[in-house]
Amino acid sequence: FTLALSAIDMAMWDIKGKALNQSVCSLLGGHRDRVVTYASGALMRPFNLEFMADMAPKLVEMGFRQMTTQMGAEPTAEREVARIRTVREAVGPDIDVMCDINQLWDVNQSIEIGKRVEEYHLYWLEDLVVRVDYQGLARIADALTTPVAAGEYVYGIRPFRHMLEHRSVDIVMIDLLRVGGITQFHKVAGMAEAYNIPVVSHLIPEIQVHNIAAIPNGLTVEYMPWTIRLFEETPAIENGEIVVPDKPGLGLQFSQDAIKQYQVS
């Protein structure tokens, strides 16, 4: 249900912006004209250490100052830690490195391995345990010095209330499709702000840049390039930041090739 609601909601915001000749970011408050973005998808779980050691510096050369990798599939804790060590040694101490576990660990694993990677000063550890284990997440967040992020698997807005009330996270991550669209995104962002907790985005950077740039507690935008080919033009990446489109609405135009590819006759 929330996926369909999100599509309608995003379309309505786009229409409103075009009718008023303003960008969606401007309609939402227009806090900034660009925000930091982190490279995602290039250091994923199937890739071996040699590939990661080679790819991570290339992301820095592309201008990214933040990047995310993954843990959660290795047979031993030592091999999990090796993934983080490899990326950190490849990029040095001045680049922000995050890590996504995709809900694959339990609480004890999260604390054990989380403590072992603290020396690598991760920017955050993401989605360590199943999303509804608010008390478990709170235990992890309390035990680790590394910030704990979660929220991408949450549908709707009510679960975020439980997450915040249990002090389960240090950073709230919002998936625009699962939460219910732009309108619901900003309800969650407001809740997080009341707890003095920053917000980051999950996927769809072309649209999420409007959301993160418009809120005072917006921290960074995930730059996953999966949806770039759907549009004629996408927001520019400059020096590790994503630029907010200044065109009316979302500032996006679907590619004719994409329309032909996905058209249902």
Language-model-derived ranges and their functions:
Residues 38-40, 68-70, 98-102, 126-128, ...:
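A cross-family glycoside hydrolase active-site/sugar-binding cleft signature
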Residues 65-73, 120-126, 168, 172-176:
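Active-site groove signature of glycoside hydrolases
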Residues 20, 77-78, 101-104, 123-128, ...:
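Short acidic/polar alpha-helix capping motifs at helix-coil junctions
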Residues 26-29, 49, 74-87, 106-109, ...:
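Active-site-adjacent beta->alpha loops and helix N-cap segments on the catalytic face
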Residues 1-97, 102-104, 108-111, 115-119, ...:
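N-terminal capping/lid subdomain adjacent to the active-site entrance of alpha/beta enzymes
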Residues 115, 121, 132-241:
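Shared catalytic-loop signature of beta/alpha-barrel
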